[in-house]
């Protein structure tokens, strides 16, 4: 038995703290009061309401060359925010009829999922000058999809678009209609697109420079009923990596990086960089190690964060976290982490953890790797958290755990001299706004203009920055 498997086996029998069950596989819960880090925060920026409701903030990107931060509202608007957060301007409205873009934003999970700014966005004469990319849901299913649903049913499409600004320094988008790069036919209404991102820590001499990573959910429903995440001929349940400026992809609208793991494999899509994910909402790179952390939302049992590498299989739907997936109600407690071909989580927790009792739960979100020094208690920490209830967690980036909740520690916010959860902070803000206190957070993380960690949510329109 490997060291990791032996450790898990000992944990399953040794701890009296927490009863183990097929729907609660860990014997040790998250320690609610141990190794807690409390940090200060500021209300860095406020997005305008949309139709009388708070903006559904999804993602924030800080290009080096333009001196501001771009923030996405899931309803289809991208805002330009000054570095100090005081000036918020509408940069691009995808709903503007000039663009003829269909946005399906009904329900909690549909809308514009993410966006990315090309690393050459602010470099005149460069191929990526002025280019940004959006990844969103559309109710226009008439065009033929580049990536079929894997079955007969199609609920909507998720579409990757390229926009080209004439002047990246402008406070409002001044380019023309977008160019469509790829279209996915979604078999179900949930688990749509995840994050779009370029690796921000590579230089133009690195083969990863300018390569666009695309998080794609498993198609939805529950339990991945068509086993799309493990099917290398289907686009769902994957992380793609493409060259958005290339033309050698199957539809001629993007390129295939030569170092992608399945290039030349007739039984796999060449766009695939990693697979076996359920709903990869967010990922982030470590500036020091280059590791790419992916937070992947579990079914009904385990939430996880993993390090994804070239060609990695993150396990779904054969595995949910460190355990064999049986059904939406159970995992197999025997032989955890026993398949050497699978990349298992570095940290995970159970949806049934006592920490979440009485609260909306659960869906892994984040992440951010803090290598700064302005907030010493966060230095060298990987931050992630839970989307619905807004719990923020940390583990040590220099001493990575090997699964389980033992290294999942809490981050609380200093709110008027008291250590509070993000949900509690938002509820106080809701009362101040004259709104009913929110029951959930819908948390995401972003990066500020100087590498600060931003906390986004869908409940009060406030973007918070962690500060010294």
Which ranges hold each PLM region?
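Bacterial N-terminal signal peptides
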Residues: 6-16
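Acidic, Gly/Ser/Thr-rich repeat motifs that build Ca2+-stabilized beta-propeller blades
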Residues: 20-223, 282-285, 290-298, 360-399, ...
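Long, low-charge, small-residue-enriched segments that form tightly packed helices used
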Residues: 312, 323, 328-331, 342, ...
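Acidic/polar, solvent-exposed loop segments in beta-strand-rich repeat domains
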Residues: 221-234
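Mobile, glycine-enriched helix-loop/loop "lid" segments at the mouths of ligand-binding/catalytic clefts
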Residues: 246-248, 308-340
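N-terminal secretory signal peptides that target proteins for export/translocation
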Residues: 1-3
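Blade-edge beta-strand/turn elements of extracellular beta-propeller
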Residues: 27-52, 85-106, 162-187, 208, ...
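Repeat-solenoid scaffold signature
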Residues: 266-306
């Amino acid at each position: 038995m490997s060291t990791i498997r032996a450790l898990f086996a000992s944990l399953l029998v040794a701890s009296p703290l927490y009863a183990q069950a097929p729907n609660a596989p860990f014997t040790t819960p998250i320690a609610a009061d141990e190794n807690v880090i409390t940090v200060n925060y500021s209300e860095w920026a406020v997005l305008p309401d949309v139709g009388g409701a708070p903006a559904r903030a999804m993602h924030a990107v800080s290009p080096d060359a333009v001196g501001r931060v771009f923030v996405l509202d899931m309803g289809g608007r991208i805002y330009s925010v000054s570095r100090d957060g005081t000036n918020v301007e509408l940069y691009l409205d995808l709903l503007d009829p000039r663009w003829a873009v269909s946005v399906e934003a009904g329900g909690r999970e549909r809308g514009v999922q993410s966006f990315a700014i090309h690393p050459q966005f602010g470099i005149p004469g460069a191929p990526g000058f002025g280019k940004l990319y959006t990844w969103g849901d559309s109710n226009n299913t008439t065009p033929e999809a580049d990536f079929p649903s894997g079955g007969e049913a199609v609920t909507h499409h998720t579409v990757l678009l390229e926009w080209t600004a004439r002047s990246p320094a402008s406070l409002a988008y001044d380019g023309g209609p977008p160019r469509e790069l790829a279209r996915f036919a979604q078999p179900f209404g949930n688990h749509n697109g995840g994050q779009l991102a370029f690796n921000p820590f590579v230089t133009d001499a690195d083969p990863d420079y300018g390569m666009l990573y695309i998080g794609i959910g498993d198609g939805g429903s529950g339990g991945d009923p068509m086993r799309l995440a493990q099917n290398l001929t289907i686009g769902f349940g994957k992380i793609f990596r493409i060259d958005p400026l290339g033309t050698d992809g199957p539809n001629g609208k993007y390129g295939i990086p030569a170092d992608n793991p399945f290039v030349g494999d007739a039984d796999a899509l060449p766009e695939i960089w990693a697979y076996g994910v359920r709903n990869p909402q967010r990922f982030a790179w470590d500036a020091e190690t280059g590791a790419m952390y992916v937070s992947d939302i579990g079914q009904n049992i385990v939430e996880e964060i993993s390090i994804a590498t070239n060609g990695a299989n993150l396990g779904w739907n054969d595995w949910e976290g460190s355990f064999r997936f049986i059904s939406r109600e159970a995992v197999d407690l025997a032989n955890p982490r026993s398949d050497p071909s699978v990349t298992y989580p570095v940290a995970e927790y159970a949806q049934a953890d006592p920490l979440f009792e009485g609260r909306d739960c659960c869906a892994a979100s984040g992440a951010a790797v803090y290598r700064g020094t302005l907030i010493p208690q966060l230095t060298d920490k990987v931050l992630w958290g839970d989307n619905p209830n807004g719990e923020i967690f940390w583990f040590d980036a220099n001493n990575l755990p090997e699964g389980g909740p033992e290294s999942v520690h809490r981050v609380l916010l200093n709110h008027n001299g008291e250590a509070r959860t993000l949900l509690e902070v938002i509820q106080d803000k809701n009362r101040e706004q004259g709104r009913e206190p929110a029951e959930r957070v819908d948390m995401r993380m972003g990066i500020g203009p100087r590498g600060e960690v931003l906390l986004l949510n869908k409940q009060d329109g406030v973007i918070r920055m962690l500060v010294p």
